[in-house]
Amino acid sequence: MDPESKPVVLVACKVLLGTVKGDLHDIGKNLVAMMCEGAGFEVIDIGFNADPEKFVEAIKQHQPKVVGMSAMLTTTMRAMGYTIKAIEEAGLRDQVKIMVGGAPVDAEFAVRIGADGYGSNAPAGADLAKKLVGIA
């Protein structure tokens, strides 16, 4: 790929990414964002320490197909479940696929909190996003 060229953006395929409330670690989320952009997604990054309401408002505003949440700490993992619950309570859960990741997170935890998938690293996160929207 020519260094000056930009990746082809998948029409209407937005991925919303954020690190959950209480967590200030965003390197992993940033890597997933870069991988998703490289895969052709439009990425909306709501940053770190994002509370459930910030995710809900961003979903309403940007209408992504995929929402990705990151947590680096065991103490902030629960915020993922709270965020999914807030998305459900806002009536938005059927509009998005949710993927989770981060050092303390695993596939079993993802199932337990109601996520649609788990990415063990940045490339896996981008691959999962493609799978969740049916292009992989």
Model-derived regions, located:
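Long amphipathic N-terminal alpha/beta scaffold segment
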Residues: M1-L24, G28
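Short, charged, intrinsically disordered terminal tails
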Residues: K131-A136
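Cofactor-cradling patches in redox/metallo enzymes
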Residues: K29-A39, I44-A115, N121-K130
